[in-house]
């Protein structure tokens, strides 16, 4: 019982002191968090600061960063701290994190911060993505690739990303409850590379039907994506409902709909009138 309680207390303690910025650093390069000290500061102003003394005053000649002299990144959100990390690596350490290389090897000794640096922005909401991006290579990303993308967004200050993964899961659940069969659902929901154009009310069923394991896979993936975005302090934008329904909804469900016709030869979903 004592061991169980001790384990529970340790788990609670670890959760209480979880630091998303340190986790991000360690994903960039294992052990990198030990070379930094990230400090979350309460402020209405979006900012980050880079320092190396902890008090904002360099009273001695700057020394290379080390275990007892870490690079200090302050910010009023984890995303802003991540921007500060990226700024330091790029402008102080000469390390450029690219979209195709999110894990550069950091030197054992990082360059010193010669003087305190502060950057602010009045742009409170920084949005990313549109529907089309979710049906390019992103349609087939796994959790490992999504982790890198969320890190990339954080490093570049994105705090309001569109989160459209798994929208088809919600639609499937709703249509099944309305009496549609799995086969009929498959004829309405598009395949992975065409989901964006289906969600934009341009076509039905093209590239489908989706296999049953796809829905569970994408539901699980979206839950991980949302959890990580929220952990970083982002505000994910979830798709709303625009009135789209299957083109046969009038016949099947007795709904008052408007026929949207064709889009480049594709049957479009109907719209609620």
Give the positions of each predicted feature.
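Boundary of Sec targeting at the N-terminus
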Residues: 17-19, 237
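Aromatic-lined carbohydrate-binding surfaces of glycoside hydrolases
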Residues: 29-44, 49-59, 65-78, 83, ...
